[in-house]
Amino acid sequence: MSDLDDSFAKLLGRQPSDAERQSLYRVRDALGLKNNDALWLVLMALQHYQGQYEKFPQAIAQAAKDTLVNFKVTADATVKASAEAAKADLAQAVAAAAQEVAHNTSAKQMWQWAAGCIAVAFLCVGLFGWYMHSSGKDSGYQAGYGAGYTEAKDEKAAAAWANTPEGRTAYRFAQSGELQRLARCSGKGWKVEKGACYPYPVANEGTYGWALP
């Protein structure tokens, strides 16, 4: 294992790939660096995080696509259920109307009215079902698209913030474990009083703080 590979493994916890190794060699030759130069650690860290940030756009696009698909499936199911319920209600109303007509007309007129009502019922059910499917599908898809776009937009904003100096500092702070200790006031020599975290001196040890990132 070369000094370069050893430095890479100590910093990132794994061996560099061939592509990463060749890229680092090009930087070494261009800048005239030695394998044990301290600048290597900085260059390796920058290369690693550049690779991580390049994955964000693809992840955002996939999240938006998955959200749209889920909303479309839900919207289609809702429209179908509404159409079936409307058909049942309409059929029940037609049946009730036919029974009322049967009590007030002769047998011949009753059959004429029943046939007419059935024909009208089938026509209404078909037209109503088509209307519900068309309008519900369009509105459901638009609602899903809007929600998916908002979610993807929020993820994109979070990724952009992570690339700022404040975001990188917060990331290093979280990696060190100090961020959780601060958020929960769980460090040695700390206590919570009235919703605030206060330090107090530990006997024979002094006062404890936290490590800077």
UniProtKB/Swiss-Prot annotation:
InterPro entries: DUF6753. The gene is mobE. It holds the Pfam family DUF6753. This is Protein MobE. Keywords: Plasmid. It comes from Acidithiobacillus ferrooxidans (Thiobacillus ferrooxidans).
